[in-house]
């Protein structure tokens, strides 16, 4: 679960990095 792009560092209820690894239906786009 690591992300290095934009937004927060993918935690447990805040996924934002859609260009790293964590990209759930949170805030990607």
From Swiss-Prot:
It is found in: Secreted. One of its GO terms (cellular component) is extracellular region. The record marks 15 as: Important for Cav2.1/CACNA1A calcium channel binding. The modification Cysteine amide is found at residue 28. One of its GO terms (molecular function) is calcium channel regulator activity. Could be used as a diagnostic tool for the autoimmune disease Lambert-Eaton myasthenic syndrome. Not hydroxylated; hydroxylation, on a synthetic hydroxylated MVIIC, has a significant impact on the oxidative folding but not on the biological activity. Expressed by the venom duct. Residues 1-2 form a propeptide. Keywords: Amidation, Calcium channel impairing toxin, Disulfide bond, Ion channel impairing toxin, Knottin, Neurotoxin, Presynaptic neurotoxin, Secreted, Toxin, Voltage-gated calcium channel impairing toxin. InterPro entries: Conotoxin_omega-typ_CS. Disulfide bonds join 3-18, 10-22, 17-28. Omega-conotoxins act at presynaptic membranes, they bind and block voltage-gated calcium channels (Cav). This toxin preferentially blocks P/Q-type calcium channels (Cav2.1/CACNA1A) (IC(50)=0.60 nM). Also shows an inhibition on Cav2.2/CACNA1A channels (IC(50)=7.0 nM). Belongs to the conotoxin O1 superfamily. The presence of a 'disulfide through disulfide knot' structurally defines this protein as a knottin. This is Omega-conotoxin MVIIC. It comes from Conus magus.
């Amino acid at each position: 679960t690591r992300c290095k792009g934009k937004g927060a560092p993918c935690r447990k209820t805040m996924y934002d990095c859609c260009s790293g690894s964590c990209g759930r239906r949170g805030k990607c786009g």
